Amino acid sequence: MKYRRFGKTELEMPVFSCGGMRYQHKWSDIEWSEVPDEGQKNLEATIHRSVELGINHIETARGYGSSEMQLGPVLKQFPRKKLIVQTKVAPFATTREFLDNFNTSMDYLQLDHVELLS
């Protein structure tokens, strides 16, 4: 895999990313029991193969429905330093609303930080 420096940071980004818009089972928050086993296994295999190929930038968003929730258990299977995780949170009228949504993302992703937030 080829990597490029991300802007003026020291972050080495793969030239390909693993985008999470289509990871979700639904475009809304759902209960874990609603996620089909086959779909979750496919997501897990996709992420494992991506990381195996050097595609370690995993991108998702709060607005991608169940994507973050489904990614959380998969991301835990990798050494944290091996991944570059990015999520996105829409702007809100208040700081409290923004933080509530960001914290929901972090809870679903089962992470204590993300490398990139947009």
Feature annotation, model-predicted:
Residues 70-73, 88, 97-104:
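Generic beta-strand or strand-like secondary-structure segments
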Residues 27-35, 48, 93-118:
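Glycine/proline-rich, positively charged
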Residues 22, 62-64, 89-93, 118:
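Active-site-proximal loop/turn and secondary-structure-junction residues that shape catalytic pockets
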